Amino acid sequence: MKVYLGIDTSCYTTSLCLLNEQAAVLADERRILTVPEGKRGLSQSEMVYQHVRNLPELTEKIASYVAGNTVCAVAVTDKPRRRDDSYMPAFLSGLGCARSLAAMLNVPLYRLSHQENHLLAAWRAVGKEPKEPYCALHLSGGTTDILRVETDGDSTVITRIGGTTDISAGQFIDRVGVALGLPFPAGKYVDRQSLTALGEVNGFPVWHRDGSISFSGRESHIQRLITAGETSCEIICAQTMHTVLNGILELLDTALAGNEYKTVVAVGGVMENNFLRTSVEAAMRRRRIEFIPAPQGFSADNASGAAFKALREYHKAGI
């Protein structure tokens, strides 16, 4: 059986994924990087160190799924975004591993950005991207972007049309979570706490202008509430999630105002959040916009988009 390997070494997860000819996941191995308690992140050198340790172990785990099959192509993320000024050492870990494997196996190696990996993780479940331009919402620990995506023949053009001017939605949530004593990354813990809040909870308005939003002021406000100690953890978490939602909806309102897009794709680790996922879906339904989130479990960092890239490019090349 022909199989396709994807590799992604992002800021906080080492990921390998193996797909078959039908783009079904045969193996999905991930390891979240270890962040010391109370810390809000890692340095790039720490990320590289952990990726270098994780890659051989995850490769050994995935090897049993490769046995008896033929790896036809490998794809790897090599930078955060498909831009000349986009660079992050963490991705060199995966790139080095992918180059070595592709050379040893004598198979093609394809590169893509981490952002493209996220988008393809969503489209893998659908099968193919639309011919007309679509709108993408990328929400993760380091990114809050609204994108215009257009597939033109063999190339995909991604243009940022909006997003945050300061901290991302993921950073906002993580900073609040760590201040509350929750583990980092804090997204799933803040999500769980928010769902237990009693009574009606509203978020705070978010500054917005011409497709840009700012979360830093609201993060500072919520940090002051935490310091004051008069608001429960559950309420703080719910207020944070509702505030993030307010920002997301402002971005989407601006992007969709011209009625250019029929489809919105939502990707990134923050979109694993149950409240945000269902709320954005409901908002798009009211607008009669097709809403395509990455499959549950594949919004967070993973390598399924890279593996899907390997499969598609291999068939395009007619090898």
Language-model regions, residue ranges each:
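A contiguous, well-structured pocket-lining segment that forms one wall/lid of small-molecule binding clefts
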Residues: 188, 192-264, 270-287, 311-317
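Conserved phosphate-binding catalytic cores of ATP/NTP-utilizing and phosphoryl-transfer enzymes
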Residues: 1-2, 107-135, 308-310
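Glycine-rich beta-strand-to-loop/alpha-helix junction loops that act as flexible
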Residues: 76-79, 140-142, 265-273
